[in-house]
Amino acid sequence: MKDIEIAQKSEMLPITEVAQKVGLTADEIEQYGKYKAKISLPLSAREQTKRKLVLVTAINPTPAGEGKSTVTVGLGDAFSLLNKKVMIALREPSLGPVMGMKGGATGGGYSQVVPMEDINLHFTGDMHALTTANNTLAALIDNHIYQGNKLNIDQRRVIWKRVLDINDRALRHVVIGLGGATQGIPREDGFDITVASELMAILCLSKDISDLKKRIGQIVIGYNFDKEPVTVDQLGVTGAITLLLKDACKPNLVQTLAHTPAIVHGGPFANIAHGCNSVLATQTALNLADYTITEAGFGADLGAEKFLDIKTPVLGKTPDTIVIVATARALKMNGGVAKDNLDEENVAAVEQGFANLKKHIQSMKRYNVPVVVAINKFTQDTDAELAKIVELCEQDDTKAIVADVWAKGGEGATELAKAVIESCDNDQEFTRLYNSDDSVEEKINKIVTEIYGGDGVEFSAKAKRQLRQFEKLGWNHLPVCMAKTQYSLSDNAKVLGAPKGFKIHVREFVPKLGAQFLVALTGNILTMPGLPKVPAADGMDVDENGKISGLY
């Protein structure tokens, strides 16, 4: 059966019963129908949990993804089978990849969060609220310029873009304000995808609504004619933008097919944003369950690095164990096998591609966090390929366990769960990659050399000018969010495996003072993706009874 068919045949518990599993009362949730709810914050004081945190990441993926969410869900269900008090914390899917390349993003097979159709489509409206808030701010900026421009905003240097929660390459570069004197001030503009919006990052890094409001006020929307930054606070609309997000900042509660409680909240991409679910979601799970299993987008070079260097300082908690998801097909691709031949057995290519997994293991251990490798089993994998991965990991002094979570759900990950539980009891002191007082160049160089395995960084003339400006403005202390291809450790998507001797090319920076990081745009990475030649939307339908098919 397809994933959507499995989900549609499942019997969900009322969300009130799911909430009770982690001690949430009816007064502490706001129901969105029978099977979804928002968690009301702040929660009342309760007994201290073990507060163990497991971060699930992956190797550099194939275009279809390696099942990181599927493993996260299956692992959570396995913890439940072992009678552990557990919660899963995932990101919300964006309609971009749902309609584009990957289809849905709620796990797969018998390791899914449900109701999957709702979560993948409009869910509780968080994405729409973010899109509206972002575009309201854009409209207020252009209105301010049109109505006299008291702040002397240079319309050539407005950096706040409009957003849309779908891949649409035609909107990357637009000209607005055309049509005459009453239609606004003409200027160049563009659209990003909603999940790349600074408001998404702010939502995911805020500790409470007061912090959300403070961060929104700090957003730099552009520069005046004296080249000084202009903020939302100066524009005077901080309260208006915050109130549009007052419900979106509350974590969403759902369940897995096996009824394990799951929080699905916030959805920044890891290649063009920081790739982690909200601090509020993770903190809520830590307060309610002994074990919180969360994930960070794409490979360990992107989502995990940003989780460790950007999210954990705000969260105030570092992972007790990192699980790296690997697949035979991704190793074969990193070993040089063409995409059309990945289903064929090729143990030699698995061994060749292991260099990619080995680099990610090394990078995560650099933070002094225990690492367990989860080999996500696909139906076409052979015993020889899976055995080779286990063997190579053991030679690298890393525990690796095959997880069959797509076919078996939590039962396919009980051995993995036992290994992770044991690993969580190791009390190791976390080691940070860089310090806040390192220069921006030093921070990026450490990411490139220690996490990517590169030789260094090259900055464009524009990036160098921006670095000088950031130093004058006192922004050097901020962490760096690298915007880079997910398919390679380098900034060239075609260079697979574990390349050496390369440099990362930073073409420009985007300061995100509300999110409190600087985005470094590398290579040809885009903040508004395009749809593929045959988008996933082509196979989707809904019948006369409202039953959805083809979602994935």
From Swiss-Prot:
Fetch the SUPFAM superfamilies from UniProt. Answer: P-loop containing nucleoside triphosphate hydrolases (SSF52540)
Does the keyword field hold Aminoacyl-tRNA synthetase? no
Q: Name one GO biological process term.
A: tetrahydrofolate interconversion
Q: Which reaction does it catalyse?
A: (6S)-5,6,7,8-tetrahydrofolate + formate + ATP = (6R)-10-formyltetrahydrofolate + ADP + phosphate
Which GO MF terms are attached to this record?
A: ATP binding; formate-tetrahydrofolate ligase activity
Pathway linked to the protein? One-carbon metabolism; tetrahydrofolate interconversion
Which parts pass through the membrane?
none
| Domain of life of the native organism | Bacteria
In the UniProt record, does the keyword Nucleotide-binding occur? yes
Q: Where does ATP bind?
A: T62, P63, A64, G65, E66, G67, K68, S69
Q: What is its EC number?
A: 6.3.4.3
| Enzyme class per UniProt | ligase
Provide this UniProt record's keywords sorted from A to Z.
ATP-binding, Ligase, Nucleotide-binding, One-carbon metabolism
* UniProt-listed HAMAP family: FTHFS
Q: Record's family?
A: Belongs to the formate--tetrahydrofolate ligase family.
Q: Which NCBIfam families does the record cross-reference, listed alphabetically? A: PRK13505.1 (NF010030)
The name under which this protein is listed is Formate--tetrahydrofolate ligase
